[in-house]
């Protein structure tokens, strides 16, 4: 299974990546609306599902989604990763449901309904599959330095965010 991790930390080949000590939910940019959204997601998580969005390790199924996040998240890197022997997949969901939820932040009934779609693993028109793991292993460093990241993001913006037109995308998709 090919997967991609976007992270600000520097890792080496064969390093194990674990969830961060602090959550993205603890950052200063994580406002009250986002906290409410994550609270509803937590409340709507089906019984028996053991996914913790606050402390889990998010990994993308598609390189194009990893590239998009890398060009948004400053000082980030992209790693091709594989599961360790004892890796646990907690959930696979379409991250776009979370983005859609942001449009209904003041409508708790709609938020609960959309959270159900996320936890059921339903897809949107153009899904962005995120997988929540306990750990993964670095199998390849795709973006490991600021220069490569800057070149990628420059090309990404020149192509108006059209990932499929990026040379970098095709070069790394084939390898």
Where are these regions (language model features)?
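Short aromatic-glycine-(Arg/Gly/Cys) micro-motifs in beta-strand/loop hairpins
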Residues: 24-52
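A short linear-motif detector with a strong N-terminal bias
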Residues: 36-38, 57-61, 109-111
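Extended catalytic/binding region for NAD+/ADP-ribose chemistry, centered on the ART fold
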Residues: 47-71
């Amino acid at each position: 299974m090919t997967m991609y991790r976007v992270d600000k930390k520097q890792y080496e080949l064969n390093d194990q990546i674990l969830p961060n000590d602090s959550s993205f939910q603890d950052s200063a940019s994580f406002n009250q609306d986002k906290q409410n959204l994550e609270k509803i997601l937590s409340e709507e998580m089906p019984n028996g599902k053991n996914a913790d969005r606050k402390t889990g390790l998010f990994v993308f199924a598609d390189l194009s989604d990893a590239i998009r996040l890398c060009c948004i998240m400053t000082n980030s890197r992209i790693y091709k990763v594989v599961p360790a022997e004892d890796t646990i997949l907690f959930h696979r969901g379409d991250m776009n449901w979370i983005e859609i939820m942001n449009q209904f932040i003041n409508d708790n009934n709609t938020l609960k309904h959309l959270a159900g779609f996320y936890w059921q693993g339903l897809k949107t028109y153009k899904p962005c599959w995120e997988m929540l793991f306990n750990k993964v292993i670095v199998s390849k460093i795709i973006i490991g330095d600021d220069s490569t990241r800057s070149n990628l993001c420059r090309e990404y913006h020149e192509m108006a965010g059209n990932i499929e037109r990026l040379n970098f995308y095709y070069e790394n998709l084939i390898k």
